Regions:
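Generic structural signal for short, solvent-exposed loop/turn connectors between secondary structure elements
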Residues: 1, 71-74, 114-115, 182, ...
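Short, solvent-exposed loop/helix junctions and linker helices
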Residues: 6, 89, 97-100, 150, ...
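NAD(P)-dependent short-chain dehydrogenase/reductase
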Residues: 43, 130-137, 147, 159-231, ...
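Residues in well-ordered alpha-helical elements
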Residues: 64-67, 86, 93, 104, ...
Length: 323
């Protein structure tokens, strides 16, 4: 199979490229990435000379480039996105352009070039927030209620993808995932920032009271779920992908990281809260489990310790990103 992977130099995208080439060495992958601050070709050093892999630096908003690449492939796997909520609050424009216009350009390319199979990666943040302490979880039938420019842009892209299926018969699938963690994550997100700050001897910042709850998904479990959706998912369907950490708060996660790194709670610094900060996310991943047989393989503590060790062993990788 020939794949176009967008955003394949980013955190989740690069993990997927590595996963896919290892599992299916006969596949060929074109990786289209603009190489913004979050894209890093060092993530893909191990495959850069693989004859089945090709990197193209470019923008998904460029229709001529997108058309030329989609003509060569059977499947588009669309990761490319601006994803950092704080950055979307400071400047929403790049999120609107990349996440909405870029998705439109890719959909048009897939439609014009033989209705190519299209998988769209999205987020659980499109559903808004759940009440802290409740047992409610997001499911595929949860109404959309985005609260940040980032999540609103992803919600818009999800609706566009579905519209291209309903209007033009484009063979699409969508996955909405929980927050990811693991190797190659840019050190501005909770796990990477906390771990690298400790390694630098700095305080670990925690927003507000630290009681915000997220569902955390190890990136390799996410890659396996996407692979199953590509192989066996029903066209036109959406699948939610969650982890094994439901109802663990941010402050509990930071305390675990500190414990595993032999530090104390004196290394925590509570900082001003983020505007519009959603209190709780939790995912019901029953559908993908029942239909495709997927469930997370990595326990949270096991994967967290592996992530800490990865950052310890790859100091040259993250230090360059923090300077």
């Amino acid at each position: 199979m020939k794949l176009l992977v967008t955003g394949g130099a980013g955190f989740i995208g690069s993990n997927f490229v590595l996963y896919r080439l290892k599992k299916y060495p006969q596949d060929s992958i074109i990786n289209l990435d603009k190489l913004t601050y979050a894209g890093n070709l060092e993530n893909l050093k191990s495959v850069e000379k693989n004859p089945q892999y090709e990197f193209v630096q470019g923008d998904i908003c460029n229709p001529q480039l997108v058309d030329s690449l989609i003509k060569k492939v059977d499947l588009v796997v669309h990761f490319a996105a601006e994803t950092h909520v704080d950055r979307s609050i400071l400047d929403p424009a790049p999120f609107i352009k990349t996440n909405i216009e870029g998705t439109y350009v890719l959909l048009e390319g897939a439609r014009k070039n033989g209705n190519k199979r299209f998988h769209h990666i999205s987020t659980d943040e499109v559903f808004g927030a759940l009440e802290l302490g409740s047992k409610t979880k997001f499911s595929e039938s949860t109404p959309y209620n985005p609260h940040s420019p980032y999540s609103a842009s992803k919600a818009s892209s999800d609706h566009l993808v579905r519209a291209y299926h309903d209007t033009f018969g484009l063979p699409i699938t969508i996955s909405n995932c929980a927050n990811n963690y693991g190797p190659y994550q840019f050190p501005e997100k909770l796990f990477g920032l906390s771990i690298t700050n400790i390694l630098e001897g700095k305080k670990v910042p925690v927003y507000g009271d630290g009681l915000y709850v997220r569902d955390w998904l190890y990136v390799l479990d996410h890659c396996e779920a996407i692979d199953l959706i590509i192989q066996k998912g029903r066209v036109g369907e959406t699948y939610l992908i969650g982890g094994l950490t439901q109802d663990i708060s941010n402050i509990e996660i930071v305390k675990k990281i500190i414990k595993y790194m032999n530090k104390t709670e004196n290394d925590i610094e509570y900082v001003k809260d983020r505007p519009g900060h959603d209190r709780r996310y939790a995912i019901d991943w029953t559908k993908i489990n029942k239909e495709l047989g997927w469930s997370p393989k990595h326990s949270f503590d096991e994967a967290l310790q592996a992530t800490i060790e990865w950052y310890k062993e790859n100091e040259n990788w993250w230090r360059k990103l923090k300077t």
